[in-house]
Amino acid sequence: MESFENKIAVVTGGGTGMGRELVLQLAKANCNVSMCDVIEENMDQTMDLATSINPNVKITKHVCDVSIKDQVEKFRDDVLSEQQSDSINLLFNNAGIGGGQSFIKSDIEEWEKVFAVCWYGVYFCSRAFMDALIKSDEGHLINTSSVNGFWASLGDGVPHTSYSAAKFAVKGFSEALLNDFKVNAPHLNVSLVMPGHIGTDISQNTGIILGKRPEDLDENELQLMKE
């Protein structure tokens, strides 16, 4: 995609960190953006920053837990309505949380929630927005995995199973889509991003979704949030 000008991008996890930076860079490139997050106040800050960079693009915000299919489908419907379009050009599956370190010792509900956000969030959003991507003249799906998507460890003595398993799934899904798009939707592209450890505010969203405050997280959990 040579230019983002007048395109429509969807960014999950747009309230903070890499998601916020994506929104700002897209706005700077004259791209209209719809973002979701679980914390509306963070999206308000992102919107203020984006509109100060470029007041001429359309930025919309939507509260959505990407691990819940019904919320994702409502997010899609609201995006298309507010952007007044039946298509989008870019989908950035960026949202994620940490936690659920041990398959043996971690709380089952927490383990499954982390996996759901980090994997099913990518799947549900890709599924929900696929028709809108296909309807575009040129579309691109960008999935965020992690260095832990090919190395499932933070080091000796630190279990990292739920997050790593989900990020491996994102990597495999993205690689499989390369051929699927080539055969069935050649005007679409897919990219995989595998960042290392980044100082984002993932702990805040993790706490909201898992019902924990940052100060309630143990030392290992805090280490996971720094990615």
Feature annotation, model-predicted:
Residues 102-103, 110-112:
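Substrate-binding pocket helix/loop in short-chain dehydrogenase/reductase
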Residues 183-227:
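SDR active-site lid
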Residues 2-33:
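Canonical Rossmann dinucleotide-binding motif of NAD(H)/NADP(H)-dependent dehydrogenases/reductases
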Residues 31-45:
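Conserved glycine-rich Rossmann-like NAD(P)H-binding loop of the short-chain dehydrogenase/reductase
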Residues 126-127:
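A short, exposed helix-loop element centered on a Lys and neighboring polar residues
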Residues 40-41, 63-74, 108:
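The beta1-alpha1 cofactor-binding region of Rossmann-like NAD(H)/NADP(H)-dependent oxidoreductases
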Residues 146:
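Residue(s) in the substrate-gating loop at a strand-loop-helix junction
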